[in-house]
Regions:
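Residues on the lipid-exposed face of transmembrane beta-strands in outer-membrane beta-barrel proteins
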Residues: 36-40, 59-63, 75, 118-124, ...
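Extracellular/periplasm-exposed beta-strand and loop segments of Gram-negative cell-envelope proteins
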Residues: 45-50, 83-115, 148-176, 207-216, ...
Length: 253
């Protein structure tokens, strides 16, 4: 048996032992939960002046109490190709309309919005059915660290004006604190691995510009005012609830 097969078999056994255990849904249970999710978000506030729609991939890890309160950590990585900033590299364009590399040849310069946040959350589950009191309407509040910037790529080209630390003069790095609210539905399967959550979220980023100069606007002071970066979007995720296995009964003659 090759190494991959052994790892797959071990993971399958681990998953089956914990998440396939049959648990009655008539009563809430306490259990750890790990999940992965995808989401999309529309930018608002100051963020909308720089970027448009974001895709988001994330992880969550937490603990659900018998009271149906929950707490934990969640993190999202943001990625997009929707840039609303214009003219960033206009001063590097030659008379032929090209940005040239170190060999004097036309170069391709690409920019991509990127971001990340890491939050601590607290949530409350409001059950809708007596048959499964571990599923229902989920409300979460969270807060933590947020960062967003422009990723600048020149691929196989070397463009001296935007290499290494010079990129910092164009990347619009902003960091700060964020708050987030989530409203959706959470389904914990009592008898299997098909457990999911889905809903809407609203995020407010209270960030600051972290660069002291923008090379494309050297005569314009970088604002030191607090930014309000807003996002409104959806999230769909799958998670593994780590139910404890039911004790087995043994009979002896």
């Amino acid at each position: 048996m090759n190494r991959f097969a052994r790892i797959f078999l071990l993971g399958s056994c681990f998953h089956c032992h914990f998440s396939h255990a049959q648990v009655s849904g008539s009563e809430p249970v306490a259990l750890p939960v790990v999940g992965i999710h995808y989401g999309g978000a529309f930018s608002g506030g100051d963020l909308a002046a720089r970027y448009g729609y974001f895709n988001r991939l994330g992880l969550t890890a937490g603990y659900k109490l018998k009271s149906n309160w929950s707490f934990g950590l969640e993190s999202d990585f943001w990625f997009s190709d929707n840039v609303r900033l214009t003219g960033i590299f206009d001063h590097l364009v030659d008379d032929a309309g090209n940005i040239t590399n170190d060999l004097g040849m036309p170069a391709s310069v690409l920019v991509y919005p990127r971001g990340v946040h890491v939050n601590a959350y607290i949530g409350k589950l409001f059950t809708l059915s007596k048959n499964n009191q571990n599923s229902g309407i989920l409300v979460q509040l969270s807060g933590g660290y947020l960062l967003h910037r422009l990723r600048i790529e020149t691929n196989d080209n070397v463009v001296p004006q935007i290499e290494l630390d010079y990129k910092k003069g164009y990347d619009r790095l902003s960091t700060g604190f964020n708050t987030q609210q989530f409203l959706g539905y959470s389904f914990l399967n009592n008898r299997g691995s098909v457990s999911f959550y889905a809903g809407l979220y609203f995020q407010q980023g209270f960030t600051y510009n972290r660069r002291t100069i923008n090379f494309d606007q050297p005569d314009i002071p970088v604002s030191t005012a607090r930014r309000l970066d807003l996002q409104t979007g959806f999230r769909v995720g799958w998670y593994i609830p780590f139910y404890s296995a039911e004790p087995r009964e043994y009979y002896y003659n």
